[in-house]
Amino acid sequence: MIMLVFEGQEIETDAQGYLKNSSDWEEAIALLLAKQEEITLTEPHWEVIRFIREFYKEFNTSPAIRMLVKAIAQKYGEEKGNSRYLYRLFPKGPAKQATKIAGLPKPVKCI
């Protein structure tokens, strides 16, 4: 069992650092997870993270990259809803990193 220590509490994660229980997440934990991913969160990052959390609440699944790009484009327009923009924010993979920082399970189609 792997744990993330946050404010003196142990929070269970999987071997890749994804939270086991998404209800353990809060924005302060996102900052810690982002630091582990070597990402400094800016408002555009938060926009994607919050969007992914809402997507998860609605569909009970984390979006794979293709679905994420399409959904972001529908909500925020083509300027933000494209792979290049999302990879600039999350260089190791928008679906993978943003989902992890958002405290959600790893997307099924993520390797």
From Swiss-Prot:
Protein localization: Cytoplasm
Active site: 110
UniProt EC number: 2.8.1.-
Keyword Transferase part of the UniProt annotation: yes
InterPro entries in UniProt: DsrC-like_C (IPR042072), DsrC-like_dom_sf (IPR025526), DsrC-like_N (IPR043163), DsrC/TusE (IPR007453)
GO biological processes: tRNA wobble position uridine thiolation
Molecular functions per Gene Ontology: sulfur carrier activity; transferase activity
Keywords for this protein: Cytoplasm, Transferase, tRNA processing
Membrane-traversing stretches: none
Enzyme class: transferase
GO cellular component: cytoplasm
Annotated Pfam families: DsrC
Keyword Transferase part of the UniProt annotation: yes
Family of this protein: Belongs to the DsrC/TusE family.
Subunit structure: Interacts with the TusBCD complex. Interacts with MnmA.
Function: Part of a sulfur-relay system required for 2-thiolation of 5-methylaminomethyl-2-thiouridine (mnm(5)s(2)U) at tRNA wobble positions. Could accept sulfur from TusD.
Entry-linked PANTHER family: SULFURTRANSFERASE TUSE (PTHR37010:SF1)
NCBIfam families registered for this protein in UniProt: dsrC_tusE_dsvC, PRK11508.1
Protein name: Sulfurtransferase TusE
